[in-house]
UniProtKB/Swiss-Prot annotation:
Binds 2 magnesium ions per tetramer. It comes from Desulfatibacillum aliphaticivorans. Tetramer of two alpha and two beta subunits. The keyword rRNA processing does not apply. InterPro entries: aa-tRNA-synth_II, aa-tRNA-synth_II/BPL/LPL, Phe-tRNA-synth_IIc_asu, Phe-tRNA_ligase_II_N, Phe_tRNA_ligase_alpha1_bac, Phenylalanyl-tRNA_Synthase, tRNA-bd_arm. This is Phenylalanine--tRNA ligase alpha subunit.
Length: 334
């Protein structure tokens, strides 16, 4: 073992002496002092050395390692580091810009809608996405046999717990805690068993509620007209078309002039010149009864819209699924 140490020392020092550049020194350093180098291999042989020789051999091995480290240090001073020599930085090259994230288009639209309503004096309410059947259906005047309660349309967690199908439950929860006047919007995620180019199982919705004395359909039209003109432009035509919702009476769908063909008729609007964007109506008296409001003194209106629907119309997107595919080629356009 003593002879091996001496031979390794002689060979290593000779190799260091004959090295001609920093790269060769780096390679020799790895060969002799690396984790799998010759010195470490020699150290592993200490287990076979007789006990009475171990102190001497151990001292010689450590001296070898220290001597080689000193020799390599002097060689690096002479030639410099191979790594430093190879990694020359050209400071005249342009830098690589850092990738910076941005707001998702749905987030942008959602914030824009919320900003419009807060400037109109609305509060923002948040609530649970896993909701009781009572708040999601019963308190909103959905009969027990209403199609929306079917498994085809609703994700049931248990017999009386669902993933909310709209954010309307927050209207009921708000009225339970607050006496009129009420002016609130409820943005959030909702869930329905539906998936195609215009529907996803999870989507974003914003619903609103106004309750006070003397509230009329004219107030509803004024608020929603302001919303449409703020999101699109003040020349965008809109109409209120009679419809039905269990929690409003009368009810109306709100259509705007087709943003694709400007009302002349195209495939997107089924050649009608109009596109549906949201539902609305005067709050049904039975909804007020569930929260203990006196229907002889107050009235109110409610409305709801899908954020994806608004974004599709504003940006001219024909497939709702593009918003959720995380394709940067698409998202970077916004």
């Amino acid at each position: 073992m003593k002879t091996q140490i001496q031979e390794l020392r002689t060979q290593a020092l000779a190799d260091i002496e004959s090295a001609g550049d920093a790269k060769a020194i780096d390679e020799l350093n790895i060969r002799y002092l690396g984790r799998k180098g010759l010195v470490n291999d020699l150290m592993k042989g200490m287990a076979k050395v007789p006990a009475d020789e171990k102190p001497l051999i151990g001292r010689l091995a450590n001296e070898l390692k220290n001597d080689l480290q000193d020799a390599f240090a002097k060689a690096v001073e002479k030639f410099g580091s191979g790594k430093e020599a190879g990694d020359v930085v050209d400071v005249t090259l342009p830098g690589r810009p850092r990738k910076v994230g941005g707001l998702h288009p749905l987030t942008t639209i959602n914030l824009e809608i919320c900003d419009i309503f807060t400037r109109l004096g609305f509060d923002i309410a948040q609530g649970p996405e896993v909701e009781l059947d009572y708040y999601n259906f019963e308190a909103l005047n959905f009969p027990k046999d209403h199609p929306a309660r079917d498994m085809q349309d609703t994700f049931f967690v248990s017999d009386n717990v669902v993933l909310r199908t709209h954010t309307s439950p927050m209207q009921v929860r708000t009225m339970e805690k607050q006496k009129p006047p009420v002016r609130v919007i409820a943005p959030g995620k909702v869930y329905r068993c539906d998936s195609d180019i215009t529907h996803t199982p999870m989507f974003a919705q914003v619903e609103g509620l106004v309750v006070d004395k003397g509230i009329s359909f004219a107030d509803l039209k004024g608020v929603l007209t302001t919303l449409v003109h703020q999101i699109f432009d003040d020349k965008t035509p809109l109409r209120f078309r009679p419809s039905f919702f269990p929690f409003t009476e009368p009810s109306a769908e709100v259509d705007i002039g087709c943003v694709m063909c400007k009302g002349s008729g195209c495939r997107v609007c089924s050649h009608t010149g109009w596109l549906e964007i949201l539902g609305s109506g005067m709050v049904h008296p039975r909804v007020f009864e569930f929260v203990g409001y006196d229907t002889s003194e107050i009235s109110g209106f409610a409305f709801g819209m899908g954020v994806e629907r608004i974004a599709m119309l504003k940006y001219g997107i024909d497939d709702i699924r593009k918003y959720y595919e995380n394709d940067l080629r698409f998202l970077n356009q916004f």
